[in-house]
């Protein structure tokens, strides 16, 4: 046999070789129907921008891929599909900018993305790829709409919505930042009244919130969702006008009712016209017109100066019997509670600010330790933990929590109050007045009304419009395609009209994980047997920026489909982990700063495996890190060291038959490294796993590495540097994929050192440390301690009166 001479590590040739080998052998293919130990490893499918993958994408995908590869080595049948979220305003706007139809642009972008994703070594099974723009996919998006429509969860109603003059479409509240569009930070968002389709997600507010308590999700993600759902426990209290109008208000603090000195209605409240006097009508109407043009997010802002006008009318405070003035103000929103509040300026900051501005009465009704009914209020005091009621006849002196229940019960007995739970969450507006999206499958007939498109007629295919530019009319460009929207009514056959709005792109991504296992099926959206086998998703990794929109909507759609009998589970993701953010040289990446990292450049220069490991080594995966060009060379040097060890082991094995035995110290370190790396990889602590492998490699270089030691190292490296590990595995004499070899064998007994360090104390003070054999008996350890010169200085030859002995840890000599 000819000697094989050591060679240098060439990442480009190694990676090209193994990507081709994986393709030929079907290494990354999963037996989806026949899997015995299914593990669905999901990563957030990307929007295929023209710019291609950015480093944030790669950071997210590689972290998820490492988890999938680790689970495969652990014996699972891992399903790691990928697809493309290609509908939506981003694609449409870019197409308009470059003058190319999105139907031409998107396939080119997807092709580039797919090439890049393969290049970085993802273990994706591309046979199950989905594209949201494919009619074979959005047929089922439309089917889901129809299921919710028939279940009463999809409704059309007129509503005040956020309208971006630049995007020329409706925005969700989450897309409005400080009153401006998130996509156009210099464009002020307007309010418009439009007929829109909504999914009634508010009906699921309670389970959406309650299920978070037991969800195995990143704590930060759960907190964001819980705050967005925003449960408030309180009471609905009725104020009556002299004319008999009942104005219900929601309050979380009925104990402060005696301090309610005025009422405030939202300008949109239906009773405003009824309670406004003729003297105040002109002022009130003008104010309502001004507020109607404001966006809801700005109105909610705590920093915004409060404005309002008096209606001229009064209502009766049900607790005091006093008449309180009725105002309207922009800081009260119709979409929360009842659209009316009882203002308690003594104990609410917004009410205090408004009362000071309008010179309205301010009364203390809760006093803390050292305060009484006459203690002045320099500012609102909303939270008084040990507060008791004052200026509240019949309840003075009661703790506020007790008074809260008592006042609610007393008013409930009179029919003037009832306990109520409110939520901050609003229904999901899915209508979009744009072109590039799935048409909403509804037909309007003058005779039959609103008619769902029959399922047999799905998909409602998006027509190929040459002119798809949006306008300011409040309707979609599809409203200009008369030959498309004019259709016979499915019920009566008369000429009818299609819905011309398209659905929100977040609906596309709210169910894509359900489609993956059945992506090759045209007869069902998701096969019942496959869905039961693979769902809920075992591991989902993505960005926290999707906590409110995508993740909330995906949970809602799954819950709705369960209630409608289509799936057997309520929660789609068994585990979710939010990854961190990558910055460049301490600064957030942006084109304007010129510090955007192009992954292709680094993969070309350093290789995909070096790039993968460097990204994972930047810092804790769930926090992110700072990308600095100087750091990546250290990872390359590490891989070069491993390569040299493998090459040396290969040539020595040829010469000596590979019969060498490793030292006990190296065996012990190998097992300790296996323990650390497998544990850290499972918990996504990738940076510390890599650090442990680096320590192990340094020890191997200082010792005599054998094939067993290097095989264990190669298996540990496989999730992180898959091409590199495959090549090392082959060079160590194996003919099958490293991904089929399993995790290295771990023996806890061999990870424990034979010797331990005893702390020796004299009278409770540390005087020395001794290295002794593990399991040393007490009498032997005490004798060794007494013989230690450092200890003898303090014992002066005396025998101890008492010995405190902790096996393998402590000898304390008490004289």
Per-segment meaning from a language model:
Residues 2-42, 72-81, 104-112, 217, ...:
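Conserved oxyanion/phosphate-binding beta-strand-loop segments in alpha/beta enzyme cores
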Residues 4-19, 55, 141-367, 475-477, ...:
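NTP-handling and nucleic-acid-processing catalytic cores
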Residues 8, 16-17, 21-25, 97-254, ...:
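Residue patterns forming the tRNA-binding/recognition surfaces of aminoacyl-tRNA synthetases
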Residues 31-102, 129-144, 251-252, 318-354, ...:
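N-terminal catalytic cores of NTP/NDP-binding nucleotidyl/phosphoryl-transfer enzymes
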Residues 150-151, 155-162, 419-448, 569-572, ...:
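Helix-rich, typically C-terminal accessory recognition domains appended to large enzymatic cores
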Residues 247-269, 428, 434-435, 440, ...:
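Conserved phosphate/anionic-ligand binding catalytic regions in large, soluble enzymes, centered on
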């Amino acid at each position: 046999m000819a000697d094989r001479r050591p060679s240098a590590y060439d990442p480009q040739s190694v990676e090209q070789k193994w990507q081709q080998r994986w393709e030929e052998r079907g290494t990354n293919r999963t037996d989806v129907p026949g899997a015995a130990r299914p593990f669905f490893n999901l990563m957030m499918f990307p929007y295929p921008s023209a710019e291609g993958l950015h480093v944030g994408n790669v950071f997210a995908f590689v972290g998820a891929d490492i988890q999938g590869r680790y689970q495969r080595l652990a014996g699972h049948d891992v399903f790691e599909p990928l697809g493309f979220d290609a509908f939506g305003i981003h694609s449409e706007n870019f197409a308009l900018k470059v003058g190319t139809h999105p139907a031409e642009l998107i396939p080119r972008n997807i092709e580039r993305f797919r090439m890049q994703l393969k290049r970085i070594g993802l273990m994706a099974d591309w046979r199950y790829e989905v594209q949201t723009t494919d009619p074979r996919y959005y047929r089922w998006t439309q089917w889901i709409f129809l299921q919710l429509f028939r279940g009463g969860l999809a409704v059309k109603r007129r509503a005040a919505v956020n309208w971006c003059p630049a995007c020329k479409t409706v925005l969700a509240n989450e897309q409005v930042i400080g009153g401006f569009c998130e996509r156009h930070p210099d464009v002020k968002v307007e309010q418009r009244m439009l007929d829109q389709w909504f999914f009634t997600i508010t009906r699921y507010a309670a389970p959406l919130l309650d299920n978070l308590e037991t969800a195995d999700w990143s704590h930060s993600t759960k907190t964001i969702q819980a705050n967005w759902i925003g449960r408030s426990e309180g009471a609905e209290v009725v104020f009556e006008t002299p004319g008999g109008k009942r104005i219900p208000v929601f309050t979380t603090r009925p104990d402060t009712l005696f301090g309610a000195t005025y009422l405030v209605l939202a300008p949109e409240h239906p009773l405003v016209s009824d309670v406004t006097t003729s003297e105040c009508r002109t002022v009130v109407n003008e104010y309502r017109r001004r507020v109607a043009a404001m966006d809801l997010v700005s109105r909610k802002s705590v920093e915004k100066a409060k404005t309002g006008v008096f209606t001229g009318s009064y209502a009766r405070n049900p607790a005091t019997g006093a008449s309180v003035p009725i105002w309207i103000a922009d800081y009260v929103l119709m979409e929360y509670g009842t659209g009316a509040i009882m203002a308690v300026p003594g104990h609410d900051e917004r009410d205090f600010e408004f009362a000071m501005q309008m010179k309205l009465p301010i009364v203390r009704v809760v006093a803390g330790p050292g305060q009484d009914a006459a203690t002045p209020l320099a500012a609102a005091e909303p939270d008084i933990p040990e507060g008791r009621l004052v200026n509240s006849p019949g309840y003075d002196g009661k703790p506020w929590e007790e008074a809260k229940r008592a006042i609610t019960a007393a008013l409930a007995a009179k029919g003037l109050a009832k306990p109520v739970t409110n939520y901050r969450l609003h229904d999901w507006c899915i209508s979009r007045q744009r072109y590039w999206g799935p048409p909403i499958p509804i037909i309007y007939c003058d005779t039959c009304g609103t008619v769902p498109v029959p399922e047999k007629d799905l998909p409602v295919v998006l027509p190929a419009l040459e002119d798809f530019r949006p306008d300011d009319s409040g309707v979609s460009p599809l409203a200009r395609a008369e030959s498309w929207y004019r259709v016979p009514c499915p019920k009566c056959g008369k000429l009818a009209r299609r819905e011309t709005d398209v659905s929100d792109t977040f609906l596309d991504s709210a169910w894509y994980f359900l489609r993956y296992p059945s992506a090759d099926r045209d007869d069902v959206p998701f096969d019942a047997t496959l869905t039961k086998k693979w769902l809920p998703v075992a591991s989902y990794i993505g960005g926290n920026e999707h906590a409110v929109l995508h993740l909330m909507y995906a949970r809602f759609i799954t819950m709705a489909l369960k209630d409608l009998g289509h799936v057997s589970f309520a929660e789609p993701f068994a585990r979710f982990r939010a990854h961190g953010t990558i910055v460049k040289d301490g600064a957030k990446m942006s084109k304007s700063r010129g510090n955007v990292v192009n992954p292709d450049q680094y993969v070309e220069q350093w290789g995909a495996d070096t790039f993968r490991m460097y990204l994972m080594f930047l810092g804790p995966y769930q926090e992110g890190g700072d990308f600095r060009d100087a750091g990546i060379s250290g990872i390359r040097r590490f891989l070069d060291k491993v390569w040299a060890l493998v090459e040396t082991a290969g040539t020595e094995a040829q010469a000596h038959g590979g019969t060498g035995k490793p030292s006990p110290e190296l065996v012990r370190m190998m097992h300790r490294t296996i323990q650390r790396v497998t544990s850290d990889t499972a918990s996504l602590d990738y940076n510390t796993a890599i650090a442990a492998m680096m320590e192990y490699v340094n020890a191997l270089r200082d010792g005599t590495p054998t094939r067993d030691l290097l095989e264990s190292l190669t298996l540990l490296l496989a999730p992180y540097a898959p091409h590199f590990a495959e090549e090392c595995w082959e060079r160590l004499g194996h003919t099958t994929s490293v991904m089929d070899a399993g995790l290295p064998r771990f023996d806890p007994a061999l990870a424990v050192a034979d010797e331990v360090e005893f702390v020796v104390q004299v009278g409770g003070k540390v005087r020395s440390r001794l290295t002794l054999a593990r399991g040393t008996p007490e009498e032997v350890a005490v004798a060794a301690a007494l013989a230690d010169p450092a200890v003898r200085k303090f014992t002066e030859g005396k025998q101890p009166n008492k010995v405190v002995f902790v096996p393998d840890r402590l000898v304390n000599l008490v004289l």
